[in-house]
Amino acid sequence: MRTVRDLEVEERRVLVRVDYNVPLEGGRVVDDTRIRATLPTLQWLLERRARIILCSHLGRPKGQVREELRLAPVAATLSGLLGQPVRSVRDIVGPEAQEMARRLQPGEVGMLENLRFDPREEQNDAEFAAALAALADCYVNDAFGAAHRAHASVVAVARLLPSAAGFLMEREVQALERVLRSDERPFVLVLGGAKVSDKIGVIENLLPRADALLLGGGMANTFLRARGLETGRSLVEEEKVPEAQRILDLAAARGVRVELPRDVVVAPTMSAVSQRRIVPVTAIPPDQAVYDIGPETVRAYSAVIAGARLLVWNGPMGVYEVPEFREGTKGIAEAVAGCSGFTLVGGGDSAAALQELGLAERVGHLSTGGGATLEYLEGRELPGVAVLMEEA
């Protein structure tokens, strides 16, 4: 894959696609992780006095201008992190954007408006891509989180300019390739989250090489049901129970150790946190639902994690948005951070737990991609990565 090191960038206009799809509250950025992740690329370009034109999407405006999804607050946050002005325009490819691109001096940074305000972005529209390309001399994609989208700023524009990956994109692909290609053993797969359907592809692609599969979150209930256990009022994908059984059979045939929760935290409802209690999985009351894994499960999983040479963790062990149901996820986060092997953690709640505990620096790679990371682990080709591997 071509990287930014392969481009002539000195004093040139560089269109940089970033993934600044960050949470905003009251017009302020509340989590700048994705912005910080692009700083190595931007600082490298600024050292070479490039004229940087940033473009990103934010939220799902569906081709309409929505005031609360403008990128000005993101530009302000980036400005503080870079220690220099970031000029944001309220335009994507129109006169204001063209004027900003023309006036940019070497070592300056500008930011286009939210790409998804224009419906042509998500259509991978050739005309829109040409208008973006006309603003710059070359293109850098540092938006791994959007690499699974065949959109104009991800795919079409990369074919119109000398193009390459930024350092974040490079790091993401290298980490994921290591997981997919490495023969380091034991290889442990830790999967959580609500739905089996979201993780089936990952399990099917990685199970043939895994030594252990540890399951938590709502998806574990579907596997417990496949093992013939009662799960009370818990979230279960009934139509996926046969699929879960097939995976359990496949794992058994391949000698893969599958660990399901041994004890769980139950409550009558998600909001009835004061009534929560820990029960063995064999004794889930019919009027209660599972909202987290229990301490015995955390200990058992932690012992398996400690011996891993290669580990992938994606998805929380419980309902992470409710503080009382975070303990299982936190316990797994501590175990993963303590693992001496190479650890790759998919974003979302898994990453949030590591950051909350101050352990983010202790994992091998903390991915910024949500859907993109899952699709890569499924063995699928990502359009935004594939285009950077095409012959120039």
From Swiss-Prot:
Its main location: cytoplasm. ATP binds at K199, E321, G347, G348, D349, S350. It catalyses: (2R)-3-phosphoglycerate + ATP = (2R)-3-phospho-glyceroyl phosphate + ADP. Gene3D superfamilies: Phosphoglycerate kinase, N-terminal domain. Its EC number is 2.7.2.3. GO terms for molecular function: ADP binding; ATP binding; phosphoglycerate kinase activity. SUPFAM superfamilies: Phosphoglycerate kinase. Substrate binds at D19, Y20, N21, R34, H57, L58, G59, R60, R116, R149. GO terms for biological process: gluconeogenesis; glycolytic process. The keyword Oxidoreductase does not apply. GO terms for cellular component: cytosol. Pfam families: PGK. Pathway: Carbohydrate degradation; glycolysis; pyruvate from D-glyceraldehyde 3-phosphate: step 2/5. The keyword NADP does not apply. It comes from the Bacteria. Keywords: ATP-binding, Cytoplasm, Glycolysis, Kinase, Nucleotide-binding, Transferase. Monomer. HAMAP family: Phosphoglyc_kinase. This is Phosphoglycerate kinase. It comes from Thermomicrobium roseum (strain ATCC 27502 / DSM 5159 / P-2). The gene is pgk.
